[in-house]
Amino acid sequence: MALTKAELAENLFDKLGFSKRDAKETVEVFFEEIRKALESGEQVKLSGFGNFDLRDKNERPGRNPKTGEDIPITARRVVTFRPGQKLKARVENLKKEQ
């Protein structure tokens, strides 16, 4: 099971008393700000949660799994997430409790 944007909005509605429309808009604006920061090459740091970074990957050799043909995998930029210490600790504690 995965947490969706709709569920995040529902939580804002339930816990903070936002209207459903405002809750949905708040979630959309939050993620749009993260998208814009990453698109402009900025790192996103969410204290107590983790960091979103951009990483450049070099071109490398690859292989077509169907044909076995060697093909180059093109250079690209990827988004990475590194969880913060607090998030890591909370997740680790969940494992121990289960």
Curated annotation (Swiss-Prot):
Residues 51-71 are annotated as: Disordered. GO terms for molecular function: DNA binding; structural constituent of chromatin. Residues 53-69 have a biased composition (Basic and acidic residues). One of its GO terms (biological process) is regulation of DNA-templated transcription. PROSITE patterns: HISTONE_LIKE (PS00045). One of its GO terms (cellular component) is cytosol. It comes from the Bacteria. InterPro entries: Hist_DNA-bd, Histone-like_DNA-bd_CS, IHF-like_DNA-bd_dom_sf, IHF_alpha. Belongs to the bacterial histone-like protein family. This protein is one of the two subunits of integration host factor, a specific DNA-binding protein that functions in genetic recombination as well as in transcriptional and translational control. This is Integration host factor subunit alpha. It comes from Vibrio parahaemolyticus serotype O3:K6 (strain RIMD 2210633). The lineage of its organism: Bacteria, Pseudomonadati, Pseudomonadota, Gammaproteobacteria, Vibrionales.
